[in-house]
């Protein structure tokens, strides 16, 4: 897991600093707080926030893992892969890997998400339907030229895990980062 102290974080209140204080009035449910209505939904419902990749790479990768030597898990994973291809044909879905590849410690398949709408539909669906499998959801952050900003951070500090977190071998990512910094 990433050490949070390695990174800087802008204030979440940037752009909201000079607004009136929020109230403490409780909603009719008796638990949640009432928020001031603006009549305008966040732009994040329609477009991912920068620096998420809005180009060919996609804003999020979802890696769905299975233990390749566990026959039941491998069968479930292949069935899930097929179901996703049938139910979400608009998503980019890669081949079904039967062995570890890249930084991934076990076999997996990958799905790319390009829009908040796709993310909002697929991630809750996967929460319910992933069965015994673990899934890594990580962003693809890019600079203004569309080059990846920090793959290591995207795979660690910014990652979301469903199920058991698996250790990734990020040595290749780190080497590429060092080579890029040297040039």
Curated annotation (Swiss-Prot):
Family from the record: To A.muscaria DOPA 4,5-dioxygenase.
The species this protein was found in: Botryotinia fuckeliana
Pfam families named in the record: DOPA_dioxygen
Signal peptide residues on this chain, from the entry's feature table: none
Name listed for the protein in its UniProt record: Uncharacterized 21.2 kDa protein
Record field: transmembrane: none
């Amino acid at each position: 897991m990433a050490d949070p102290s390695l990174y800087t974080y802008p204030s979440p209140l940037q752009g909201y600093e000079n607004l009136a204080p929020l109230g403490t009035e409780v909603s009719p449910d008796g638990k949640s707080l009432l928020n001031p209505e603006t009549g305008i939904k966040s732009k994040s419902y329609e477009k991912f926030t920068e620096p998420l990749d809005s180009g060919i790479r996609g804003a999020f990768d979802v890696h769905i893992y299975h233990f390749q030597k566990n026959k039941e898990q491998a069968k479930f994973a292949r069935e899930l892969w097929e179901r996703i291809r049938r139910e979400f044909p608009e998503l980019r879905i890669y081949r079904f890997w039967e062995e570890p590849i890249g930084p991934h410690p076990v076999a997996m398949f990958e799905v790319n998400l390009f829009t908040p709408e796709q993310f909002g539909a697929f991630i809750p669906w996967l929460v319910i339907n992933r069965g015994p499998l673990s899934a890594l959801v990580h962003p693809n952050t890019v600079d203004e030229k569309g080059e990846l900003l920090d793959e290591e951070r995207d795979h660690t500090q910014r990652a979301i895990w469903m199920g058991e977190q698996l250790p990734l071998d990020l040595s290749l990512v780190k080497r590429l980062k060092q080579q890029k910094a040297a040039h």
